[in-house]
């Protein structure tokens, strides 16, 4: 069983709201120091908010921040800076510096013991799968360190056999990410199920030949609109194991 992390097992929206706001604030401060006018700062704020999927009620579940990797978000940010009339080399350097500064702040906060909460029922289902002998793994666009921190914080190390992160190549949503993880697990993709909260995950799974694709929609304030699933899950308690066959 292959699991996405953010928005599927992890209640990530509060952390992503804070991350989006921190990146926007950092960008505004840097452009202000460069002499940007109030109208330019307002334009930059709106462009970044739309780019990250930051809305009044939270983060859109299919937005760049929620779905894409850090590198893809960095490139999206640099593209916004180009719209603010910076050249690409300067925009890319500025985005990289901005992301590093915000990441350091969030790393300092996470070292104080703050951790993203598990979604209701996720831990119980993982332990049920472990007890039944089902191999479980995480496939995420978070870093390896971020995934391991999540596993350690919730004491899931005995439930998770392996991970595939943004540090692995190829990363999601390339179907090769699924093949790479299945190779590490010594399993055929057709013998696995994948559950995620984004169509990019589910389409990737189908293209990789995954046996069952499950869409999960309860991880966000606004339910994601999924189309590439075989089954749709609204809460973890809807999933049960059938007898000794380990089928869902």
Regions found by a protein language model. Give the residues of each.
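Asp-based, Mg2+/Mn2+-dependent phosphohydrolase catalytic module
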Residues: 1, 29, 123-131, 144-248
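N-terminal helical cap/lid subdomain that shapes the substrate entry/recognition surface
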Residues: 1-120
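Conserved G/P- and acidic residue-centered "switch" motifs that form tight phosphate/ATP-binding loops
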Residues: 8, 140, 197
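Short, flexible loop segments at the rims of nucleotide/cofactor-binding pockets, characterized by
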Residues: 112-117, 141, 169-170
């Amino acid at each position: 069983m292959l699991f996405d992390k953010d928005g599927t097992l992890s209640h990530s929206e509060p952390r992503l709201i804070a991350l989006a706001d921190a990146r926007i604030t950092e960008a505004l401060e840097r452009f202000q120091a460069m002499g940007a006018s109030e109208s330019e700062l307002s334009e930059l704020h709106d462009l970044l908010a739309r780019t990250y999927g930051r809305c009044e009620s939270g983060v859109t579940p299919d937005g760049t921040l929620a779905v894409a990797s850090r590198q893809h978000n960095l490139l999206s940010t640099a593209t916004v800076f180009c719209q603010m009339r910076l050249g690409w080399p300067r925009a890319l350097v500025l985005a990289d510096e901005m992301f590093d500064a915000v990441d350091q702040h969030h790393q300092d906060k996470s070292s104080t013991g703050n951790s993203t909460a598990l979604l209701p029922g996720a831990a119980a289902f993982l332990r049920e799968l472990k007890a039944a002998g089902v191999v479980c793994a995480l496939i995420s666009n978070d870093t390896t360190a971020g995934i391991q921190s999540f596993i350690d914080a919730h004491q899931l190390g005995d439930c998770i056999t392996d991970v595939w992160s943004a540090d692995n190549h190829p990363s999601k949503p390339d179907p090769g990410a699924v093949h790479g993880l299945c190779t590490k697990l010594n399993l055929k993709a057709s013998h696995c199920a994948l559950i995620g909260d984004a169509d990019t995950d589910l389409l990737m799974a189908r293209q990789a030949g995954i046996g069952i694709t499950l869409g999960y929609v309860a991880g966000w304030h606004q339910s994601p609109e999924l189309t590439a699933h075989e089954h749709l899950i609204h809460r973890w308690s809807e999933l049960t194991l059938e007898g000794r066959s380990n089928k869902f």
